[in-house]
């Protein structure tokens, strides 16, 4: 078995990636989320495949086909809710994974980090298009509002929006193409995940101290396979509690009403995992400015390696920057809350203050804190 594992051209790739991979001896449970994201992706592809067998991407039958899946298909309700709530678990793991990278300075592995940002954009695009497919009220109006933002692009905006719609409004052509893209993107994401891992294995994993761990490595299997397996059990337990007891808690009741272009919902809002970006978008009165802020709210992650001023890699021994980091986390929670609120006083001003704080903490306060800590510790 050892000979096959180390000599077979295909199996040796798996061996070098998941079995004999040298890993730091001190990585904590915060390093579990990579494997959990892989599990989420597998769950989403499998459940999505079975949903696609019964779904029809036509405006007249899309809503009915989802109802048919839940009522008539064997365990269709389970597959549908696993897919819907699996997306939420995916984003929880994604945010924690990115947060871990920010906390421990993993963004200094620039290729891996940039690949991760591309993956984040791809997953967000996939989730957005998936939300349109059930063709409920929030599906239709969410698609209308978000795609319409592209009309803010000077000169080509309106033409671009109509090209994406396949007509003069969100309609049959839009739904069909969104289904096609929603189906193909997870496979593209899978390919990008392998590139992400390829870049990661060029440098090796970071660790909580932020120091070079070449002198103290242990094999990935069995130590981290068993540790990952515990994470898998916790994730699956959380997902199944959500699916079996609270399947609609993260959804929007409006999406149980079939799409009606003549009736606008009182509050149009995306799924909870986009609310922070949606709040930033709404905080700027100018349409183009809002769209740029929306894109920058994610793209700003690419600037983190340039904004790193500290002589230390992670925040483990940096109390001032730690404080800034946790204020940023609280700020993101406030933005998520604001994104789900109506556009009225006092939510408008809270959203604007939280949006300014979000960019200010990342661009100004965290780099300043890094320099102050260098000074205090005489690391200049």
Curated annotation (Swiss-Prot):
One GO term describing the cellular component: respiratory chain complex III
Keyword Electron transport: yes
Record field: transmembrane: 33-53, 77-98, 113-133, 178-198, 226-246, 288-308, 320-340, 347-367
UniProt GO molecular function: metal ion binding; ubiquinol-cytochrome-c reductase activity
InterPro entries: Cyt_b/b6_C, Cyt_b/b6_C_sf, Cyt_b/b6_N, Cytb/b6-like_sf, Cytochrome_b, Cytochrome_b_C_euk/bac, Cytochrome_b_N_euk/bac, Di-haem_cyt_TM
SUPFAM superfamilies given in the database record: a domain/subunit of cytochrome bc1 complex (Ubiquinol-cytochrome c reductase) (SSF81648), Transmembrane di-heme cytochromes (SSF81342)
Positions annotated to bind heme b b566: 97, 196
GO biological process: mitochondrial electron transport, ubiquinol to cytochrome c
Sorted UniProt keywords: Electron transport, Heme, Iron, Membrane, Metal-binding, Mitochondrion, Mitochondrion inner membrane, Respiratory chain, Transmembrane, Transmembrane helix, Transport, Ubiquinone
Location relative to the cell: Mitochondrion inner membrane
Topological relation to the membrane, as annotated: Multi-pass membrane protein
Positions annotated to bind heme b b562: 83, 182
CDD domains, per database record: cytochrome_b_C, Cytochrome_b_N
Entry-linked Pfam families: Cytochrom_B_C, Cytochrome_B
Residues that bind a ubiquinone: 201
Protein family (similarity comment): Belongs to the cytochrome b family.
Additional remarks: Heme 1 (or BL or b562) is low-potential and absorbs at about 562 nm, and heme 2 (or BH or b566) is high-potential and absorbs at about 566 nm.
Subunit architecture: The cytochrome bc1 complex contains 11 subunits: 3 respiratory subunits (MT-CYB, CYC1 and UQCRFS1), 2 core proteins (UQCRC1 and UQCRC2) and 6 low-molecular weight proteins (UQCRH/QCR6, UQCRB/QCR7, UQCRQ/QCR8, UQCR10/QCR9, UQCR11/QCR10 and a cleavage product of UQCRFS1). This cytochrome bc1 complex then forms a dimer.
Protein's job: Component of the ubiquinol-cytochrome c reductase complex (complex III or cytochrome b-c1 complex) that is part of the mitochondrial respiratory chain. The b-c1 complex mediates electron transfer from ubiquinol to cytochrome c. Contributes to the generation of a proton gradient across the mitochondrial membrane that is then used for ATP synthesis.
PANTHER family on file: CYTOCHROME B (PTHR19271:SF16)
Protein name in the entry: Cytochrome b
Gene that this sequence comes from: MT-CYB
């Amino acid at each position: 078995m050892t000979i096959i594992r180390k000599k077979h051209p295909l199996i040796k790739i798996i061996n070098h990636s998941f079995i004999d991979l040298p890993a730091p001896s001190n990585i904590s449970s915060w390093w579990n989320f990579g494997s959990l994201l892989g599990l989420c992706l597998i769950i989403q592809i499998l459940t999505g495949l079975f949903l696609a067998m019964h779904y029809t991407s036509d405006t007249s039958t899309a809503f009915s086909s989802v109802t048919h899946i839940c009522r008539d298909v064997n365990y269709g309700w389970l597959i549908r809710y696993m897919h819907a709530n699996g997306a939420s678990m995916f984003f929880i793991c994604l945010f924690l994974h990115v947060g871990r990278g920010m906390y421990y300075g993993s963004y200094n592995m620039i290729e891996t980090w940039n690949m991760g940002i591309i993956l984040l954009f791809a997953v967000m695009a996939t989730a957005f298009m998936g939300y349109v497919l059930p063709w409920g009220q929030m599906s239709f109006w969410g698609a209308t509002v978000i795609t319409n933002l592209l009309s803010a692009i000077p000169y080509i905006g309106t033409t671009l929006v109509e090209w994406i719609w396949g007509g003069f409004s969100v309609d049959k052509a839009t739904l069909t193409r969104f289904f096609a893209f929603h189906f193909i993107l997870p496979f593209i994401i899978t390919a990008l995940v392998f590139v992400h891992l390829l870049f990661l294995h060029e440098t090796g994993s970071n660790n909580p101290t932020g120091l070079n761990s070449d002198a103290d490595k242990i094999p990935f299997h069995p130590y981290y396979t068993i540790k990952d397996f515990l994470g898998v059990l916790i994730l699956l337990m959380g997902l199944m509690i959500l699916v079996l007891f609270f399947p609609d808690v993260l959804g929007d009741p409006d999406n149980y009403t079939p799409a009606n272009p003549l009736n606008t919902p009182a509050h149009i809002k995306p799924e909870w995992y986009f609310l922070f970006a949606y709040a930033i978008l709404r905080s700027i009165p100018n349409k183009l400015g809002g769209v740029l802020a929306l894109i920058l709210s994610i793209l700003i992650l690419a600037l983190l390696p340039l904004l790193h001023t500290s002589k230390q890699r992670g925040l483990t021994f940096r109390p001032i920057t730690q404080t800034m980091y946790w204020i940023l986390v609280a700020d993101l929670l406030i933005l998520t809350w604001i994104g789900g609120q109506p556009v009225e006083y006092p939510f408008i001003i809270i959203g604007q203050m939280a949006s300014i704080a979000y960019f200010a903490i990342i661009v100004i306060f965290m780099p300043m804190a890094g320099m102050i800590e260098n000074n205090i510790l005489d690391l200049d």
